[in-house]
A protein has these predicted regions:
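Acidic, polar-rich low-complexity tracts and alpha-helical solenoid repeat scaffolds
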Residues: 2-8, 21-266
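Sec-dependent N-terminal signal peptides
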Residues: 9-15
Length: 266
């Protein structure tokens, strides 16, 4: 998995016992450990899924290796441990601190990627946007923040190894946000709140381009106009639907023929 790869920022061979650590409490079993050993132990805990043990070890490493690349690595590893432990707020706070302290870090692209992943809140893997989990009913604020992190990544680091996956997730997020508007419009239509349905369908159409959800947005718009007796607007919308989706099931008054989430490709 991409997030578990060793980052190039690590320079394990450069580790040495740093000055200023002599005040470590005597009951600290890590007191005599070198930064490299401390990192190795923390990494072992992380890889074994013992995130509650990994986090404090990475925190110790941050202090002992302060000012070094290994300290930067410890911050990123700690953020990842928080993420894997489903501690989203702590992960985001750690990443924000890292990016504030190290704007020129060679691992900045990874920090942006991980921040996007944390907000994306996806534990199913790189291709989970093909699963049955429908993001249209999830927290849209987090989705937008995730999109912004990915957008900064692909803009600033177009050649990053994380950019291709970030682009794919950006497309998925845009589709999800559009579908959310349609989801709300559908709800209003089903309750007879046709003006509200029109407003949400129009938001989807105006804010998003070339996304699958627009077909249903047009259909809801057409039917809402019809329910309100607005024949001219209904017919105009129908012509747009016919032009863009000539084979749409909505044109015959039936539901869309596909089954499952709108974004599931196969």
């Amino acid at each position: 998995m991409m997030l578990r790869r060793k980052l190039s920022v690590v320079a394990l061979a450069a580790g040495a016992v740093l000055a200023g650590c002599s005040s470590t409490p005597s009951d600290d079993v890590t007191a005599s450990w070198s930064p490299n050993k401390l990192y190795a132990e923390a990494k072992d805990e992380l890889n074994s899924g013992a995130y509650d043990k990994a986090v404090p070890l990475f925190e110790k490493l941050e202090g002992r290796a302060a000012g070094t690349m290994l300290a930067q690595q410890a911050q990123l590893e700690k953020a990842y441990a928080h993420y894997k432990a489903n501690e989203q707020a702590q992960a985001l706070a750690t990443l924000d601190r890292f990016m504030k302290l190290h704007p020129a870090s060679p691992a900045y692209d990874y920090a942006l990627y991980l921040k996007g992943i944390v907000n994306f809140n996806d534990n199913l893997g790189m291709l989970s946007f093909l699963s049955k989990q429908d993001l249209s009913e999830r927290d849209q604020k987090a989705a937008k923040e995730s999109f912004e992190s990915f957008r900064e990544l692909v803009t600033r680091f177009p050649d990053s190894r994380y950019t291709p996956d970030a682009r794919a997730r950006m497309t998925y997020i845009v589709n999800s946000l559009a579908q959310y508007e349609v989801h709300v419009a559908r709800f209003y239509y089903s309750r007879g709140a046709y003006v509200a349905a029109i407003n949400r369908a129009q938001s989807a159409i105006s804010d998003y381009q070339d996304v699958p959800a627009l077909e249903e947005a047009l259909a809801i718009l057409m039917r809402s106009y019809d329910a309100l007796g607005m024949a001219q607007l209904r017919d105009d919308t129908r012509r747009v639907l016919e032009k863009n989706y000539p084979n749409s099931a909505y044109l015959t008054g039936g539901p869309r023929s596909t089954q499952g989430p709108w974004w599931k490709l196969w």
